[in-house]
Design a protein with these regions (language model features):
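Glycine- and other small-residue-rich loops at beta-strand/loop junctions that grip anionic moieties
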Residues: 184, 372-373, 407
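Active-site donor-binding acidic/aromatic loop of nucleotide-activated sugar
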Residues: 425-429
């Protein structure tokens, strides 16, 4: 592991101005609403009564929602302590969902795309699962989330994102029909430029190229002319949920997915975005650690359909689907079962969290986890503690150098209760670990975009891939084995009794952590 130093990242000036304009616009509107509510509250007893009634009704509504209890409690306490401020913030940012147009389009897309999952769901009941446990885990994703499992697929794991990037470039150069790319963050710098040049060359040869990025995730990396620049090179490009200086409930729900699909035969996903730091070309937080996977074979169909979920939701007409689901002849080298899946904030199914919970609950020997942020629900905490208390080797790796110091403090506030139950906590000493991966008992693994925090599990559009019965599972385990020696284990430090002040501060952080 080479030594690196922290470097400041320079933001794109145009992006900074957009971010400031949007932030100032939203802040002014929030302050105006807050000021108006205070004035009205002082002006009339009737207004005070209405505020109290509204506070009571909203509190009841939150309590009755089918969402995580910690999330509900945090909002209820905020509203009861600061009624006007709490109500304003909750009505603006506290509800998972979308404006009616986006919700309608997304629902239309999901209904239509499910039709393409159904034949696979019906055909793939007798796949070569290693055991009953993995079969049941796949069954959950198929029966509840609606995403089918596939065989005839080879999985390649990359613990080094530079290797993943090179494999991605090789696949892109071979494209003959279409390329789909969806990422939370794209930085218009050297790594992206290498990809863009390949995309433009393929587009010039008649390949349909689509690029889709989240506007908030990319706002510090690219300027407002990025979409036009790509269009000038023959590349279709769209922004998800553009930043505007107007209050919008849906602004809280971001596209955190990372997907590349080439001709429906090769696909990539994982934790890394297409920005310099993800490939250690810059070092804003020391050495960057991330991971990803390459799929080749039938399961790429699943990634294609996941891409079309949000791409189609940004247009009025229903997206064309069948032409992007070619029957590609392929014979896999291993008997893997591969299941690409996604999660979204517009339903009541916490798919991403439930996959993790299933793996932890059924682990017999070990379960290893990496996550950049550790903000856990009560259920997740109990599950991790119970597994460790039952003799399972539970280990979690978090960053050694944080990208967000407040969130890092929140992450550390969860260490003590976990460590006292036997969960082993490690911090990645060389820098920032951004990988989102989990492996259990050497039989199954997940690699994707889903962090162990509330935003990933409840508010964002996410995707991941669960797989078993292939050498990639062992490769994920080997990646963990290489990580532990360069990490600093802090288990005992947090298992020991700490001062009352520290414990009190941790309680405050955890109380409002679901809102971060």
């Amino acid at each position: 592991m080479k030594n690196t130093t922290e470097e400041k990242r320079e933001a794109i000036p145009n992006s900074v101005s957009r971010m400031l304009l949007a932030g100032i616009g939203v802040l002014l509107q929030v302050l105006w609403i807050f000021w108006l509510a205070l004035k009205l509250n002082d002006y009339s007893t009737a207004i005070q009564v209405c505020t109290s009634v509204l506070t009571f009704l909203i509190t009841l509504r939150i309590y009755g929602l089918h969402i995580n209890s910690a999330y509900k409690i945090s909002w209820i306490i905020l509203i009861l302590l600061f009624p006007i401020f709490g109500l304003t913030i909750y009505l603006l940012f506290g509800r998972s969902g979308a404006v009616s147009v986006m919700r309608r389009r997304f629902g239309r897309n999901m209904t239509m795309l499910r039709q393409y999952h159904v034949p696979i769901l019906q055909q793939r009941r007798a796949l070569p699962y290693p055991d009953r446990i993995t079969r049941n885990h796949a069954r959950y994703l198929q029966d509840r989330a609606g995403y089918p499992a596939y065989d005839n697929t080879d999985v390649t794991f990359y613990g080094d994102t530079c290797e993943a990037l090179e494999a991605q470039k090789t696949a892109l150069r071979s494209a003959e029909k279409f390329i789909f790319m969806e990422y939370h963050a794209i930085e218009d710098a050297s790594a992206w430029q290498e990809l863009e040049d390949i995309l433009a060359e393929r587009a010039a040869h008649g390949v349909e190229v689509r690029v889709f990025y989240d506007d908030v995730g990319s706002i510090g990396f690219i300027n407002s002319k990025f979409v036009k620049k790509l269009a000038g090179r023959g590349i279709q490009c769209r922004r998800f949920n553009p930043v505007i200086p107007i209050l919008n409930v849906f602004m809280n729900n971001r596209d955190h997915r990372k997907i590349t699909v080439v001709d429906g035969r090769v696909g990539f996903t994982g934790g890394y975005n297409l920005a310099e730091e993800y490939f250690n070309r810059t070092h804003p937080y020391g050495q960057w650690k991330d991971s990803g996977i390459r799929l080749e074979g039938d399961a790429v169909r699943g990634l294609t359909l996941i891409f079309l979920e949000l791409w189609g939701a940004t247009q009025k007409a229903a997206p064309e689907v069948e032409r992007y689901l070619p029957d590609v002849p392929y014979t896999a080298q291993e008997n893997a079962v591969v299941l690409p899946y996604a999660d979204n904030p517009l339903d009541d199914e916490a798919t991403g969290e439930n996959v993790y919970l299933n793996m932890i609950r059924s682990a017999k020997d070990y379960v290893y986890i990496t996550t950049p942020y550790l903000i856990l629900s009560d259920e997740m905490q109990r599950t991790l503690r119970l597994a460790a208390s039952s003799g399972v080797d539970v280990r979690i790796i978090t960053p050694g150098i944080p990208d967000k110091k407040l969130i890092f403090s929140v992450t550390r506030s969860y260490y003590a209760s976990l460590a006292k139950s036997g969960v082993r906590i490690y911090e990645y000493a060389p820098g920032f670990i951004h990988a989102k991966q989990c492996v259990a008992d050497g039989t199954e693994a997940v690699v994707g975009t889903i962090n162990f925090d509330f935003r990933s599990l409840y508010l964002h559009f996410e995707n991941a891939c669960w797989f078993c019965g292939c050498s990639a599972v062992a490769d994920v385990r080997r990646d963990f084995d290489a990580l532990f020696p360069v990490c600093r284990e802090v288990t005992q430090e947090y298992a020991d009794t700490r001062s009352l002040a520290v414990r009190g501060w941790d309680c405050v952080l955890r109380l409002f952590s679901p809102l971060m």
